[in-house]
Amino acid sequence: MTRTLRFAAPSLSLAILLVASLLGLNACSTTVPEGIASVTPFDIERYQGKWYEIARLDHSFERGLSDVSASYRQQPDGSVEVINRGYDSKRNDWRQALGRALLTGDTKRASLKVSFFGPFYGGYHVMALDQQNYQWAMVVGPDRDYLWILAREKRLQEGVRAHLLHEAGAAGIDTQKLIWVEQTRTDG
């Protein structure tokens, strides 16, 4: 069973947690952290689809989740539907959060703002990307405390992993704090 964040009583505490986390995103900053550039050129249509979370920095809204994925789908109004999903082994259940993303500024630059609750947005900036095939990406949030390494497959080639760790470290991100996400379930 998958639990989708809506405004139902059982998920209210999780929704409040997401809001608090988003508020903590550097006062809802949507700008790229100083000294980091978002990828250009960027094609949101090619970025659509399912991505597996390979690694992340720890935050309460994902703590304890394995088999995390993010799916992006462009909407007719130009926004992007975001579905984040992960398995909570303590509850023996899938958790899901629905969000909305908007490109900020230049549509050929990989900078978006994402909201999982109302008018509160946090920055989402693709700082590294397989621009030829769109098979892997590294995303930073509004500051260096938010980082995700994503891939189209559940595993990332060692050479790509080493490259991304080098890039993250060069950008001032503490790669020793990365959590390598377990991607073993086949029921999700």
Predicted regions: what they are:
Residues 2-15:
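Bacterial N-terminal signal peptides that target proteins for export
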